[in-house]
Amino acid sequence: MIRAILYRGADGQFTGYSAHGHSDYAEEGYDIVCAAVSILGVTCANSLESICGIVPEILENGSGALHYRLPASLSPEAMHDAQVIFGFLHQGLRDVAEQFPQDVNLSIQDWRKKR
């Protein structure tokens, strides 16, 4: 199962994304569920940079995992733009999870900084 997590800050705004696991919907190279989740996550990260000018901090990329978060301080305008992009990601992931509930688990969690 793919576990996708959207993270929110204390103010309720999206601050990061994580996905890991495999759907096993089909064999590697033919798994449309895995491809859908992957392209949504990568497109969000790329759009944050190319459209919004925000370079997300990539924490993990590879081995069936993608994890990134927004930089610590953004202008109100940049944060607004990031929320639009994350809204696209949220809607897309929700659609995939509803269509393939046995293959994708989507959750929204509070962002916890490691101390």
What do these predicted ranges mean?
Residues M1-I32, V42, N46-R115:
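N-terminal intrinsically disordered, cationic/polar leader segments
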Residues V33-V37:
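Short, conserved glycine- and acidic-residue-centered signature motifs
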